[in-house]
Amino acid sequence: YTTLFRFMLPSTEHSEINFDHPDTLETELLIKHIIDLREFKAVQVPIYDFSTDMRKTETFTVEPRNVILVEGILLYVEPELRKLFDVKLFVDADADIRFIRRLHRDLTERGRSTESVIEQYYATVRPMQREFVEPSKRYADVIIPEGGHNVAALDMVTARIELLLK
């Protein structure tokens, strides 16, 4: 996520930011990092603190590899980012499964309340899913149904990755 200094909002207004909109992501930095990794250069990745809605001062190092996996629900929204991927996968999960996963994550990892997660889901998560995520899946080379539990699709993806590693 982009730093909140960009939005110039006091911390009391952070909850008003739609963090599910692509504009809140540091897409340019991700593009730079992927290009660097493809050129076999290590990158320093920022660590985002969801409890403060800010970046931490420390980063972590990602070393280049022959295969780079990049995960995120908004990856295919930006055309320049899409161009960097050799294979584009979209893991399709039912809305109720996505919501349950998000609820569990936000309760256990981010200290959120059930009410705040539900409110955010209706206010921003679901609308952004419909506006950006669902339409962007048409750019995927492979759509994996059943939330990633489709064995046949996973076997095909595994075979493709193994080919890339040879």
Where are these regions (language model features)?
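ATP-dependent NMP and nucleoside kinases share a basic, alpha-helical "lid"
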Residues: K56-R110, L165
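Residue-level signal for inorganic ion chemistry
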Residues: L30, L89, A140
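Conserved nucleotide-sensing/catalytic segment adjacent to the nucleotide-binding pocket
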Residues: F7-K56, V67
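Short, basic, glycine/proline-bearing loop/turn elements
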Residues: A42-V43, P64, T114-Q120
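NTP-dependent small-molecule kinase module
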Residues: E63-P64, H104, R126-K166
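Short, small-residue-biased leader/transition segments that mark boundaries at the very start
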Residues: Y1-L4
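Amphipathic alpha-helical transducer elements in NTP-driven molecular machines
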Residues: D23-I31, D92, G111, E115-I118, ...
